[in-house]
Amino acid sequence: MPEGKIIKALSGFYYVLDESQESGKVVQCRARGIFRKNKITPLVGDYVVYQADNDKEGYLLEVKERTNELVRPPISNVDQAVLVFSAAEPTFSTSLLDRFLVLVEANHIEPIICITKMDLLKTDEERETIMAYADDYRQIGYEVHLTSTIEGDGIEKLTPHFHNKITVFAGQSGVGKSSLLNAMSPELALKTDDISSHLGRGKHTTRHVELIRTANGLIADTPGFSSLEFTGIEAEDLGLYFLDIRDRSGDCKFRGCLHVKEPGCAIKDAVEHDQIKEYRYQHYLEFLTEIKDRKPRY
């Protein structure tokens, strides 16, 4: 039986990109009743087995195991998230970036940090500040790209990361996500209004998610992580999603250390010696308080 990947779901139809051929054929499929009986809802991003009645229509037979699953937008098997933040207009926010990084790490998705609008930095001091932040995150182990769609800087180094992967874009509103996409793939120009209406405003104006074929990969046309709450993340697990904290937490004196007031805490020691940046630690404490103060849902 042929296999493929769902790239669009709309009105009970699932549009499957046939991956057994290089033709890029898309087959419109319905789901068998067995899916409803077993309470399985196929998602955009799912790898599926299907049966084709002809070249254009068929039925889904099987949904393969998912590596991850996002709720908003409903999409599965996301390989990476490009976290787009601007160097200026709006101001670069490490707090918001760290929040996105926690959410991405918790969903087992590879993050790529992309700082746009580098051309808007007017002074050497402004540029040095952004470069220092970029170095901080690189030292933690993150991929960081500095780009300017106006000057075309950095785009060519970013594009190869999309090859054969499902990618979502996320980040601040108004940071130029759609401009970045168009700089990478000029053929998307026709879709700019559509993409910017989703990505730019951070509001969902349509009821379906679609994966767009571009840069030899698939990119979601809807922003990832529209909810920025730490739902499902427990206080004792938060440190796992700060890589610089996770790598050192095994050196704490007490198992289960939350790195707040506990004696013999390797994290607080690392902060004092500038091995973990103070702002990262403060964000950890802020997020920890937010999680502890979270009202239980019944």
Curated annotation (Swiss-Prot):
Residue span, CP-type G domain: 67-228
Residues reported in the UniProt entry to bind GTP: T116, K117, M118, D119, G171, Q172, S173, G174, V175, G176, K177, S178, S179
Cellular component, GO, one term: cytoplasm
Xref: SUPFAM superfamilies: Nucleic acid-binding proteins, P-loop containing nucleoside triphosphate hydrolases
Positions bound to Zn(2+): C252, C257, H259, C265
Family: Belongs to the TRAFAC class YlqF/YawG GTPase family. RsgA subfamily.
PANTHER family noted in UniProt: SMALL RIBOSOMAL SUBUNIT BIOGENESIS GTPASE RSGA, SMALL RIBOSOMAL SUBUNIT BIOGENESIS GTPASE RSGA 1, MITOCHONDRIAL-RELATED
Domain of life: Bacteria
Cofactor: how bound: Binds 1 zinc ion per subunit.
Cross-referenced Pfam families: RsgA_GTPase, RsgA_N
UniProt keyword annotations, A-Z: Cytoplasm, GTP-binding, Hydrolase, Metal-binding, Nucleotide-binding, Ribosome biogenesis, RNA-binding, rRNA-binding, Zinc
Gene Ontology biological process: ribosomal small subunit biogenesis
EC number from the UniProt entry: 3.6.1.-
Enzyme class: hydrolase
GO molecular function: GTP binding; GTPase activity; metal ion binding; rRNA binding
Major location category of this protein: cytoplasm
Cofactor(s) the protein requires to work: Zn(2+)
Protein name, as recorded: Small ribosomal subunit biogenesis GTPase RsgA
NCBIfam families: ribosome small subunit-dependent GTPase A (TIGR00157)
Organism in which the protein naturally occurs: Bacillus pumilus (strain SAFR-032)
Role description: One of several proteins that assist in the late maturation steps of the functional core of the 30S ribosomal subunit. Helps release RbfA from mature subunits. May play a role in the assembly of ribosomal proteins into the subunit. Circularly permuted GTPase that catalyzes slow GTP hydrolysis, GTPase activity is stimulated by the 30S ribosomal subunit.
Subunit structure: Monomer. Associates with 30S ribosomal subunit, binds 16S rRNA.
Subcellular location: Cytoplasm
